[in-house]
Curated annotation (Swiss-Prot):
Family matches, as Gene3D superfamilies: 3.40.50.880, Ankyrin repeat-containing domain (1.25.40.20)
Protein name, per record: Putative ankyrin repeat protein RBE_0997
InterPro entries: Ankyrin_rpt, Ankyrin_rpt-contain_sf, Class_I_gatase-like, Peptidase_C26
Sequence ranges of the ANK repeats: 3-32, 36-65, 69-98, 102-131, 135-164, 168-197, 201-231, 239-268, 272-301
Keyword Amino-acid biosynthesis: no
Domain Glutamine amidotransferase type-1 stretches: 348-580
Annotated active site: 444, 547, 549
UniProt-recorded Gene Ontology molecular function terms: hydrolase activity
Keyword Repeat: yes
Keywords noted in UniProt: ANK repeat, Glutamine amidotransferase, Repeat
Residues making up the signal peptide according to the UniProt record: none
Record Pfam families: Ank (PF00023), Ank_2 (PF12796), Peptidase_C26 (PF07722)
Source species: Rickettsia bellii (strain RML369-C)
Length: 614
């Protein structure tokens, strides 16, 4: 930098217009950089000196120059909120769509200034209304979040697309309802926003509003602007639930008063076969239950719930049979709660008394060998022959160390109460169920049995009660919770739990397909102890240390529904198994090889050894 260039920079910094003009007339470059590699015009913009900015531009200063960080100089003008400087830059061909690498568009910066005049200055020069920010989201979405109605209207009037979808698959109308601002929602609808559009979970904005107990005025606005009201009421989310189902779950009597008459039937069902009356009765919304019954009388139809097992359900196709391990002499609280949760589902619950699987002599002597195990497996195969899923619920006993050791597991417990028959019978059932490709669920003790059978490790823990569970984001469990708990942080949930033992190391590590262990951890507690696992291939295996079958009295509607949906999702897996089995199709689900599980593992290991030259 020569002396004259230093003088020009100094004159600009000191707001000395005459000196700036003199030096420019002498031929000093108006695009020189200061010692920080910033264009000299940037100092004039920051000083809000319109005259010096104008002189520099007249003498060839670059209106699209950027500083050392790649930030356009017009960004500084936006920060000063000097409309006159912004206009002079735009008039001198500053690019209204300038977006340097890894930077946001200039229009987004204008929107974030919250100044309508500045936004209009860029719009009048052809700024791209539907551009994306550096994260891939529409800049119009940021305008909606700002809740500046004047700016939103200006963008819409210039042609911003009210039906843009963000990279998460949600139309902008979903962002608008989050603001709870009726005027913004109305503005989008008036400019053509589709009130019937769905997000990636299959929910319309009406569904989402109901799940969040949304503002009735906003809901009414959306409905009144629907082209086909009957159609929008009968749209279903991915769980098969309609607007009426969600209203019944939320207990929103105002919605029922206003819109129930739009439904030609009150017996519309979701994927699990539930009607709105099922949910209103289950959750204690008596007023809504009465409204549904009154509406059914007006329609001269009988209103049904799945709980009552009426002829309405008897006429539906065959339903899956779910085997539940139990002891007919000792029915524990958690075991009964599991059976009751399943009975609310679209399935038949069939008890299997595990004591009938183990030979009496073996149980009396607490003796185990291959002959006894094979006899238990033969009995288990008989009991599970026509079943479509297996559930091993919680109980008051621990996994027997001798049984676990025989199957390759490890149990480090000393003074616990062991149940030899239960441990052997349930591991025999597990072997049969896994070979058949049958869906499996284990709760509390069942969680430990499954992991011990799959060569996991069980340890003792001081009597532990917990509520807070951390869910792994890439798990099926997270997916289920996400669909049904939109108002909560899905990765932090409250569940009831009480146990003396824990899974120290998960099982399934010796069973590999495509280099994946059979099981993965899907939830932990605040002590980082394993709270849930699920299978990564083959038929679904889901285990829970906590108790989704036990609802606390403090649970919200959303938490009650969440627990029901965990069971509903499992029953849907059983239904898939039932259909594949009845069609003679491969029942290994994700594993397209019609071989036993053991054969598949051995084949995989043989392939790996061949590749290594062993």
């Amino acid at each position: 930098m020569n002396k004259d260039e230093e003088l020009l920079i100094e004159a600009i910094e000191n707001d000395d217009l005459k000196e700036v003009q003199k030096l420019l007339q002498e031929g000093v470059d108006p695009n020189i950089l200061d010692e920080d590699d910033k264009p000299c015009i940037l100092s004039a913009i920051r000083n809000k000196n319109l005259d010096i900015v104008s002189v520099l531009l007249e003498n060839g200063a670059n209106p699209n120059a950027v500083d050392a960080d790649g930030e356009p100089i017009i960004s500084a003008a936006i920060r000063t909120k000097r409309l006159d400087i912004i206009n002079i830059l735009l008039e001198n061909r500053a690019d209204p769509n300038l977006q340097p690498p890894r930077k946001n568009t200039i229009l987004l910066k204008a929107i974030q200034s919250n100044n309508l005049d500045i936004v209009n200055a860029f719009l009048n020069k052809g700024a791209n209304l539907n551009a994306l920010d550096i994260s891939g989201y529409p800049i119009f979405l940021k305008a909606i979040k700002s809740e500046n109605l004047e700016i939103i209207n200006a963008l819409l009037e210039k042609g911003a697309n009210p039906n843009l979808v963000d990279k998460d698959g949600s139309p902008l109308l979903f962002t608008a309802i989050n603001t709870k601002n009726l005027d913004i929602i109305d503005a989008l609808i008036k400019m053509g926003a589709n009130v019937e559009a769905k997000n990636k979970d299959g929910n319309t904005v009406l569904n989402v509003l109901l799940e969040r107990r949304g503002n009735v005025n906003i809901i009414s606005l959306l409905i009144e602007n629907s082209q086909d009201k009957e159609k929008i009421f009968n749209l279903k989310n991915n769980n098969g639930e309609t607007f009426l189902h969600l209203a019944a779950q939320q207990g929103n009597s105002k919605i029922f008063d206003k819109y129930l008459d739009y439904y030609p039937t009150v017996n519309i069902t979701d994927k699990a076969g539930y009607t709105p009356l099922y949910w209103s009765k289950l959750l204690g919304h008596t007023e809504i239950s009465n409204k549904l019954i009154e509406r059914a009388e007006e329609l001269k139809e009988t209103v049904y719930t799945k709980v009552t097992r009426t002829k309405f359900f008897e006429n539906l196709p065959s339903i899956p049979k779910i085997a539940v391990s139990y002891n007919s002499k000792v029915r524990g609280e958690t075991s009964e709660a599991t059976r009751n949760k399943l009975k609310y589902q679209y399935c038949n619950v069939e008890d299997i008394d595990y004591r009938k699987i183990v030979p009496e002599s073996a149980n009396a002597e607490k003796k185990i060998n291959e002959e006894i195990v094979n006899e238990a497996k033969r009995k288990a195969k008989e009991f599970l022959a026509d079943k479509d899923a297996l559930v091993i619920p919680g109980n008051n006993s621990s996994v027997d160390p001798k049984i676990a050791e025989h199957f390759g597991g490890q149990v480090n417990l000393e003074k616990n109460k062991f149940d030899f028959a239960r441990s052997l019978a349930e591991m025999a059932m597990l072997e049969v169920a896994i070979e058949k490709g049958m869906p499996i669920m284990g709760i509390c003790g069942g969680h430990q049995i499954i992991n011990a059978y799959l060569k996991g490790k069980i340890d003792e823990v001081s009597k532990h009660k917990h509520d807070s569970i951390i869910i792994e984001p890439d798990s099926e469990l997270a997916s289920i919770i996400k669909r049904n708990s939109p108002t909560k942080d899905i990765l932090n949930q409250e569940f009831w739990g009480m146990h003396n033992d824990k899974v120290q190391e998960i099982g399934g590590k010796n069973r590999l397909i495509d280099n994946k262990d059979l099981l993965k951890v899907t939830a932990t507690n605040e002590h980082r102890e394993i709270e849930a696992t699920e299978s990564q291939f083959g038929a679904p295996i889901r285990t829970f240390q906590f108790h989704p079958e036990m609802s606390k009295t403090t649970y919200s509607n959303a938490e009650i529904i969440r627990d029901k949906k965990i069971f509903a999702s499992f029953v849907q897996s059983a239904e898939t198994f039932m259909n594949k089995k009845s069609l003679g199709a491969d029942i290994k689900f994700k594993v397209p090889v019609k071989k036993s599980f053991t054969e598949m593992v051995l084949n995989r290991k043989e392939q790996q050894n061949n590749q290594r030259g062993i």
